[in-house]
C-alpha cells in the first residue's frame, strides 16, 4: 500500500513497527478474526483478546525495558504478507481521534518517512490513501486510536454536509 513512497528494503531492515515496549503497546495492530485464526494455527500460544470487531495480541506484562516482537515477524519479515492487519499496511500513518474528528497522523519512529517534507506526505495521502483509510475506519472503527500529541496531524477528515 505504501510501496510508492516507502522502500520495502528499508522497512525489512528496520522492523521498528513490529516491536513494542510498554510505552507503545497501545499501537498494537488490530487483527481480523481470520488473521488471528491463521496465526493461532501456527502458534497456539498467541494470546488474542477481543478489541471491537477484531483482536489484539496481549503480550502480558512488559518490564520497563522489555520488548515484545509481533509473533508474525520472522527473519524474512512479516509471515502474513498481503494478509497483514490494515494498521500494519498503512504504518507509519495512523488514524486517530482528535477531539471527536478523525485524523491521519504519522509516527515519528519511522525515520524513512518522518524525515520527508510534510507536504510530500500529504500529497501522497491525497492520491487516494486517505480516502481508503477513512473508508476502512468506517467499517472497522476499532482501528481509530486515541490521539497522541507525538503524532503530527497530516489530514483531518472532512465530512460532507
Language-model segment annotations:
Residues 1-161:
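Short loop/turn segments that flank or connect secondary-structure elements
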Amino acid at each position: 500500500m505504501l510501496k510508492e513512497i516507502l522502500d520495502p528494503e528499508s522497512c525489512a531492515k528496520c522492523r521498528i513497527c513490529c516491536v513494542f515496549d510498554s510505552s507503545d503497546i497501545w499501537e498494537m495492530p488490530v487483527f481480523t478474526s481470520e488473521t488471528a485464526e491463521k496465526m493461532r494455527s501456527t502458534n497456539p500460544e498467541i494470546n488474542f483478546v477481543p478489541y471491537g470487531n477484531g483482536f489484539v495480541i496481549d503480550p502480558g506484562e512488559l518490564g520497563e525495558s522489555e520488548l515484545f516482537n509481533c509473533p508474525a515477524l520472522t527473519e524474512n519479515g512479516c509471515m502474513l504478507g498481503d494478509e497483514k492487519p490494515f494498521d500494519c499496511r498503512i504504518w507509519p500513518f495512523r488514524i486517530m481521534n482528535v477531539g471527536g474528528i478523525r485524523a491521519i497522523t504519522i509516527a515519528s519512529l519511522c525515520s524513512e518517512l518522518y524525515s520527508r517534507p510534510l507536504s510530500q506526505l500529504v500529497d501522497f495521502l491525497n492520491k487516494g490513501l486517505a480516502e481508503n483509510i477513512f473508508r476502512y475506519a468506517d467499517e472497522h472503527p476499532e482501528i481509530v486510536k486515541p490521539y497522541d500529541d507525538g503524532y503530527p496531524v497530516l489530514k483531518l477528515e472532512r465530512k460532507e454536509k
